[in-house]
Amino acid sequence: MITNRSAQPGRALLMSTIASLALMSCASASAQTRTTSTPQITQAEAQQGAQANVQILQEFGGALTGPQASYVESVGKNIAVQSGLGNARDSFNVALLNSSVNNAFAIPGGYIYTTRQLVGLMNNEAELAGVLGHEVAHVAARHSQRRQQTAQRNSILGALGSILSGVLLGNSGLGRAIGQGIQQGSQLLTLKFSRSQELEADQLGQQYLTRAGYDPHAMATLLASLAAQNSLDAQLQGRNSGQVPAWASTHPDPASRVAAATQRAGRTAGMTNRDTFLTRIDGLLYGDDPKQGVIEGQRFIHPDLQLAFTAPNGFYMVNGTSAVSINGQNGQAQLTLARYGGSLENYIYDVFQKIAGQNAQLRPSAVQRTTVNGIPAAYATARANTGNGQVDVTVFAYEFARDRAYHFQAITAAGRSGVFNSMFGSMRRITTAEAQRVVPRQIDVVTVGPRDTVQSLASRMAYSSGQMERFRVLNGLRNSDSVAPGQKVKLVVYAR
């Protein structure tokens, strides 16, 4: 979620940098066809990629270090060299991001990223190489600049205000945004590619796999795992499975791409390095990092900031580096922080000003003061007209210290803001003892014993619901699949 620092104003700079990268790539690849050699990374791309990299790492919780990160880096560089963007491994920078979202992407300049959560979903080294190769392929094929005019910035975890500002300025309909679900909290900063570009990246990625000696079928098996994870997430969160988050939302329809990837792979074989991969990722942090807060059912608890709240029934939460979002059919909200000068009234008006931008029609009501579980608090609501009717925008702020405040910002249909009242009233401080009881989850690779079954292994998963389904998806097992003695499988357990 959020760390104990104010949100940085660097996202606009970051997007400007990425836009510049796309334009430079366009100039270098304007005459490129799929049959010519790939233009190599230019010095200008490398310089601007380095600039964007700093801010991307901030947006995504930073890069992990240690043996697991080094392993991902090694695999990523090996596969990236196959693209022709650079002749040496040192031409590329590969980062394992501390994010609990299934995501991977690359930017011009040789910068490649994957999240620890996506790595945890994988089941062999070839799948890791396939995902990273797919992302490198987008850069090699210069897809970003070919989508420049229609590219969408998906800064999930970006301020709700950026969405509302666009809506209120007429860039989209807020009613439609509510109906589709505002995708926040998922730490995604990339360009949305067309289906044809995704298929081309799949194809190029499989070519890189084959050149590197990997099994090209790994692209299909990873896509199948992503499709299964998307479906499971929707089931657990009580949302429509068509509302896919993160990597799947910018990499359309992974399920339908499985068949195409399988057909392309044909009878070609190669290495998967399954046991090596599982050994290397053993102990990898999985799910929320307590330093960013943890979601447990309907409750969010942040041990470092010593706060907790409960989302309303029927809503699901998504956590990230700088915010936690609360999403449902009847509204969306986000908890974050902003600079605080000691006045809740001024704080709330500043939040509304950021939401509205230049739109003078968003006028909040008078700020109301209250106390929530002993915490000084204040709130205000503004009504806005959209093409699909009126909506209410509510800001509810809490003073945790003279120099520190947090706030919810929420949107609902007009007159329906009460749906979040229970959540607003649930905010509380937690004790040191409560904070110490928050334990991270991690991947635990185990060897199946002679008496083990899917059910017995799943019962060891550190979740109160969906243990069987989570175990099967995590290990790429279909409903009819069983486990065999000696086989290595992944569990998610509480860190010791």
For each predicted feature, which ranges?
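Extracellular LysM carbohydrate-binding repeats and other cell-envelope/extracellular binding modules
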Residues: 467-496
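Peri-catalytic and regulatory segments of divalent metal-dependent proteins
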Residues: 30-169, 187-190, 207-242, 247, ...
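Short alpha-helical segments in extracytoplasmic peptidoglycan/chitin-binding modules
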Residues: 454-462, 468-472
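Active-site-proximal segment of zinc-dependent metalloprotease catalytic domains
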Residues: 178-186
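Extracytoplasmic and endomembrane cell-envelope/extracellular-matrix remodeling and assembly machinery
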Residues: 35-39, 50, 189, 195-452, ...
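Bacterial N-terminal signal peptides that target proteins for export
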Residues: 2-17
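Bacterial N-terminal signal peptides
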Residues: 15-25
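Helix N-cap / loop-to-helix initiation motif
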Residues: 124, 194, 215, 464-467
